[in-house]
UniProtKB/Swiss-Prot annotation:
It comes from the Bacteria. This is UPF0134 protein MPN_139. It comes from Mycoplasma pneumoniae (strain ATCC 29342 / M129 / Subtype 1) (Mycoplasmoides pneumoniae). InterPro entries: DUF16. Disulfide bonds: none annotated. Signal peptide: none annotated. Belongs to the UPF0134 family.
Length: 163
C-alpha cells in the first residue's frame, strides 16, 4: 500500500507527528523532492491519511481573564519599549545638542585661527621689512667704513710713502 501525503521536508513531517501526538505509522517513508511529497508504505491511522491534525480532547481554552492578563503583559512590554525609545530619543537629542555646540566652538576657533594667521602674516611682513632695512643700513655703514679706510690709507701713504 503506497500513499502520497504532501509534506515538504522531513522536519515538517516530524513536526506534524509531534503536534498530533496520535500520529503513528509502521513502515517506511521516502521524501520525494521533485513533487514535494512523502511516500509511505505501511499501515497508518486515519489522522495521517487525511493529513489533518486532530485537536486533542484535553485542549484548554483561554479564559477571558487569561487573555486580559496576556494583553496587559503585552501592553506593559509595549509601554516599557516606548519609554526606552523615548529615553534613547532624549539621549540622542542631548548628543545632537552637544554636536551642535561643538561645531559652533570649532567654527569660532577656526575664525580665531584665521585672524591669528593674518596677524602673524602681517607681523612677518613687518619683520621682513625691518630685517631688510637693518641689512641695508649695515651695508651702508660697511661701505662708509670702506670709504673711510680708503681715505685713511691714502693719507697714510701721503705721510709715509712706500719704499
Amino acid at each position: 500500500m503506497k500513499e502520497k501525503i504532501p509534506f515538504y521536508n522531513e522536519k515538517e513531517f516530524h513536526d506534524m507527528v509531534k503536534k498530533t501526538k496520535k500520529g503513528t505509522f509502521s513502515g517506511w517513508y521516502i521524501i520525494n523532492k521533485n513533487n514535494n511529497s512523502v511516500e509511505f508504505s505501511g499501515s497508518f491511522n486515519r489522522q495521517f491519511k487525511l493529513n489533518k491534525p486532530v485537536i486533542p480532547v484535553n485542549t484548554e481554552y483561554v479564559t477571558r481573564k487569561e487573555f486580559n492578563e496576556y494583553k496587559d503583559s503585552n501592553d506593559q512590554r509595549l509601554t516599557k519599549i516606548e519609554t526606552e525609545l523615548k529615553s534613547q530619543g532624549q539621549r540622542i537629542q542631548v548628543v545632537e545638542d552637544k554636536v551642535d555646540r561643538l561645531t559652533e566652538v570649532v567654527m569660532v576657533q577656526s575664525q580665531q585661527i584665521k585672524t591669528q594667521g593674518e596677524a602673524m602674516n602681517a607681523r612677518m611682513d613687518r619683520f621682513e621689512s625691518l630685517v631688510l632695512k637693518s641689512l641695508e643700513s649695515i651695508g651702508n655703514t660697511l661701505t662708509d667704513f670702506g670709504k673711510r679706510l680708503d681715505v685713511i690709507e691714502t693719507r697714510l701713504d701721503k705721510i709715509d710713502p712706500p719704499k
